[in-house]
Design a protein with these regions (language model features):
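N-terminal export/assembly segments and adjacent metallocofactor-ligating motifs
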Residues: 2-355, 359-434, 475, 553-596, ...
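Structured secondary-structure scaffolds
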Residues: 468, 479-482
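Conserved thiamine diphosphate
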Residues: 271-281, 456-472
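Conserved alpha/beta enzyme-core scaffolds, especially Rossmann-like or related mixed alpha/beta domains
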Residues: 151, 178, 182-183, 443-450, ...
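A glycine-rich, hydrophobic/aromatic-adjacent loop/helix-cap motif
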Residues: 209, 235, 460, 482, ...
Length: 603
């Protein structure tokens, strides 16, 4: 056989491989003789730490826990020898780390032999480094210099408890703060009387003085967050905040508002094992998101057997493209434009799930075998001169029932057969495009209206597909091809998004546009579609028969304290006494003294 180009003369490929094998074996033998030296590669302060000491060796303790290196919360298996954490592995009992996972009934003495790999990603493996990091904070720190100076001292837990409880001149040692008094829990609580005094007499709707306590934490587990919240509410403060505002609030608001806030659902995910086509918008699967290794494992399995195609829509390429069918390098912040362009094309081409969208209520959906319904057929007031312009038309406004009727505020739809308007609850199907096509409108009791579906089309029609493509930084052909493929798999296509989309000033609106793509297919809660998770642990014992019913403990305050959060989240400025007072005095209530975030939480 001729030598490959560039190979030294006289050496065949077979000969090279034979020689390399012998040489490799010699290196192994030589290395074995130097094994004491090799061991020194794996050491900690001069003590041997065998990197792969079998967990069944005498003296090795194995503890099962959960990884906190990221928010995936994968199960871990910690191997400890001589009081030193030697190695972290995946927990064979945990579904994030092992698939299929071992049953809890399996004896830990033999679970190491469980056939399915129980893996842990490199970041999880680095948990050992975190444990022994010399800069790891293990005690409370107290500021010793001006704010922002970075000057701290370590204090004991007992000192922390005393100072936050009793208060006082806690920073008398800091220049400029010698006489600053800091209230402690005891002073703020005032024997429980502060719960009955207004924190702002001019604005009593701001709540009691106990709202002066603000509890804010970063990332906390659900159980930890439950107890922190429970303590704050028992104390009498509404100001209890998790980390959401610096995490992905835009994503959660977009999801909740798209689902009408139902059940507090802030997260849906594609049913990867059963889906046929997934659009990942700004979601760095296989490298990030959570649970990262679980998503990656399922994604690789689904693409390996060729039943799943997926597209990465992202400003950068990454490991997710190794198995992707396509990468769409979108302009930063252009995700919403891409989604709107797809919506426009889908409606123009009538490639939406009309039967699903026509179901106007839960009973109609159930009768049709649908797990949910949409408001696509509900009439929306589109009269700029009407005081409720942009709101859903109500039965009383339509002249269908008296204003005193229990159904006065019920939404209104158009019967597709007769063209008559009726309450949404009184029909099994309603018209998406009543009388005048996709862009038309109708008058009901003198009020100009369109269906929600028509309003969606009117908004998307503000731009052409070419214009949306320019805003997104892609070609019009890309939008058309994505929309065509997306609507070619029935309910087994999903559009999902995360931080790459939502961490922009237009993040909520872009996220809602992507949610609409799923609604046009009617894929929510369908096999292969967009689904909810399985829930979480019952940390406070809310389930009947729970051994520790902490949520119903006798004599504890069970209600959320009154008032407006200091972050102004979850509250409407227009409903505040300050707004109403300005109106009564003939003053403009705008601009508000501070920004309010009625749809936000955890800010």
């Amino acid at each position: 056989m001729a030598n490959p180009q560039g190979s030294p003369p006289g050496i065949s490929r077979r000969g090279f491989l034979r020689g390399a094998t012998v040489l490799g074996g010699g290196v192994v033998v030589a290395g074995w003789g130097l094994s004491p030296w090799i061991g020194n590669v794996f050491h900690r302060r001069g003590t041997f730490v065998y990197p792969d000491r079998p967990p069944m060796w005498p003296g090795v303790d194995t503890t099962y826990s959960v990884c906190k290196q990221c928010h995936s919360d994968c199960g871990i298996e910690a191997h400890v020898f001589g009081g030193v954490l030697e190695k972290l592995d995946g927990n064979p009992y945990h579904p994030n780390a092992t698939e299929p996972h071992a049953p809890y009934s399996l004896d830990p003495a033999v679970v190491a032999l469980w056939p399915a790999p129980h893996s842990l990603c490199p970041r999880g493996q680095a948990g050992r480094q975190t444990v022994y990091d010399p800069y790891r904070i293990t005690v409370p720190l107290k500021r010793t210099g001006p704010r922002g100076s970075g000057q701290w001292e370590a204090i004991s837990w007992s000192m922390l408890i005393k100072e936050v409880t009793e208060g006082g001149h806690l920073f008398a040692h800091v220049k400029g703060e010698e006489h600053r008094h800091v209230s402690g829990f005891r002073e703020l609580w005032d024997g429980g009387q502060a719960r009955f005094r207004s924190i702002d007499p001019a604005n009593p709707d701001f709540g009691p003085e106990t709202n002066g306590l603000v509890i804010y934490w970063g990332r906390a587990e659900a159980g930890q967050a439950d107890f922190l919240t429970r303590f704050g509410h028992a104390f009498g403060t509404i100001n209890v905040f998790p980390h959401v505002g610096i995490c992905d609030l835009n994503h959660h608001v977009a999801t909740q508002e798209s689902l009408n806030g139902m059940g507090g659902v802030a997260m849906l995910k594609p049913d990867i094992p059963n889906a046929e086509y997934i659009l990942w918008f700004g979601e760095n699967v296989t490298e990030a998101n959570f649970p990262m290794q679980t998503l990656g494992r399922k994604l690789v399995a689904a693409t390996t057997d060729n039943h799943l195609k997926y597209v990465m829509i992202d400003v950068r390429t990454g490991n997710g493209n190794l198995h992707a069918n396509r990468w769409v390098p979108i302009a930063p912040g252009g995700d919403g434009a891409l989604a709107m362009g797809m919506i426009r094309w889908i409606i123009d081409q009538d490639r939406y799930n009309g039967e699903y969208l026509a179901r106007p209520n839960a009973h109609a959906a159930q009768a049709a075998g649908e797990p949910n319904f949409s408001n696509a057929t509900w009439l929306v007031i589109t009269d700029p001169g009407h005081p409720h312009d942009g709101a859903f038309l109500e039965a009383a406004e339509a002249g269908l029932v008296p204003t005193s009727a229990s159904t006065a505020k019920e939404p209104v739809v158009v019967d597709p057969g007769s063209g008559q308007v009726m309450p949404a609850s009184q029909t099994q199907a309603a018209a998406l495009w009543p009388q005048h096509g996709k862009s038309g409108s109708i008058k009901v009791n003198g009020i100009v209206c369109q269906t929600a579906m028509q309003r969606l089309y009117t908004e998307t029609s503000r731009n052409t597909v070419d214009e949306y493509a320019k805003l997104a930084g892609v070609s019009a052909a890309v939008i058309v091809s994505l929309a065509h493929e997306f609507t070619s798999h029935g309910r087994k296509a999903v559009a999902d998004f995360y931080r790459g989309v939502s961490q922009h000033t237009n993040g909520v609106l872009a996220g809602r546009a992507i949610m609409v793509l799923n609604f046009l297919l009617g894929n929510v809660d369908w096999t292969g579609g967009y689904i909810m998770g399985g829930g979480a642990g019952d940390y406070l014992g809310k389930t009947p028969g729970a051994p520790y019913p902490l949520d119903t403990w006798p004599n504890q305050p069970a209600h959320i304290p009154s008032g407006v959060p200091i972050s102004r989240e979850g509250a409407f400025y227009e409903k505040s006494l300050a707004y109403q007072a300005a109106q009564k005095e003939g003053r403009s209530p705008f601009p508000a003294p501070r920004p309010w975030f009625p749809f936000g939480f955890g800010i």
